[in-house]
């Protein structure tokens, strides 16, 4: 388990033992203001690596795992201001893991391409709304390509971006909602074979569902 200590700019690694209670193994420094940690295999060695977003330095720290509970020195990638939630997938069909990050200070989602060795290179930004936070990816319109959905915490709404398989996304439309979406997830919630969305509202402490139609459109349940 990895835990971000924002005030100390550290990541703490906890190792589980036979008691089932994780114990602190060690910690290491990261860029200022670590916020959200993702576990993803970026260099395709079948070992989970870490990606740490830092609000204070506007960076992503890519920390490759050795496979024995230790990690290599971080590779730091500069992104837009205030990186929040990320999504991962193969945006351009080259077999490597790519990333996208909601950058709140830029009112956009930033797309990065991976090279299969643990590096991420910024490719493009797409305008979302004010203070984007939540981000999720799946094939919303059933064309075989991954798409993006981004929730805006300040302006409300969910921006839908359809991918074309080359690493490029086109903004299709925005779902109108008054909810200040802080996180966003997807899944086939009604088992009809079509992806739906779930939005967490920060102010109302509620979970709102949107039903997908398989064409990239979503409607409140």
Residue ranges: model-predicted function:
Residues 10-13, 59-62, 108-111, 157-160, ...:
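A short loop-to-beta-strand structural motif that recurs across blades of beta-propeller domains
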Residues 9, 49, 58, 94, ...:
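Acidic Asp/Glu-based divalent-cation binding sites
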Residues 35-42, 84-91, 113, 133-142, ...:
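Beta-propeller blade termini
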Residues 1-4, 50-53, 99-102, 148-152, ...:
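Hydrophobic beta-strand segments that make up the repeating blades of beta-propeller
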Residues 15-32, 64-81, 99, 113-130, ...:
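Blade-edge motifs of beta-propeller repeat domains
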């Amino acid at each position: 388990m990895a835990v971000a200590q924002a005030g100390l700019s550290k990541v703490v690694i906890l190792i589980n033992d036979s008691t089932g209670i994780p114990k602190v193994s060690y910690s290491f420094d990261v860029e200022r203001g670590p916020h959200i940690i993702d576990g993803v295999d970026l260099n395709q060695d079948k070992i989970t690596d870490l990606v740490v977003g830092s609000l204070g330095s506007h960076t992503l720290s890519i920390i490759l795992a050795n496979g024995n509970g230790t990690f290599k020195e971080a590779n730091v990638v500069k992104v837009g201001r205030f990186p929040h939630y990320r999504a991962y997938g193969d945006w351009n069909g080259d077999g490597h893991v790519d990333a996208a990050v909601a950058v709140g200070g830029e009112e956009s989602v930033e797309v990065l391409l991976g090279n299969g060795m643990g590096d991420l290179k910024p490719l493009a930004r797409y305008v979302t709304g004010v203070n984007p936070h939540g981000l999720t990816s799946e094939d919303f319109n059933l064309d075989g390509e991954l798409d993006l959905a981004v929730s805006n915490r300040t302006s409300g709404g969910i921006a839908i971006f359809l991918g074309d398989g080359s690493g490029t996304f086109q903004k299709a439309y925005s779902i109108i909602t008054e909810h200040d979406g802080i996180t966003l997830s997807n899944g086939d919630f009604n088992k009809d074979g079509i992806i739906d969305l779930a939005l967490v509202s920060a102010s109302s402490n509620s979970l709102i569902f949107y039903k997908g139609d398989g064409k990239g459109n979503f409607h409140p349940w």
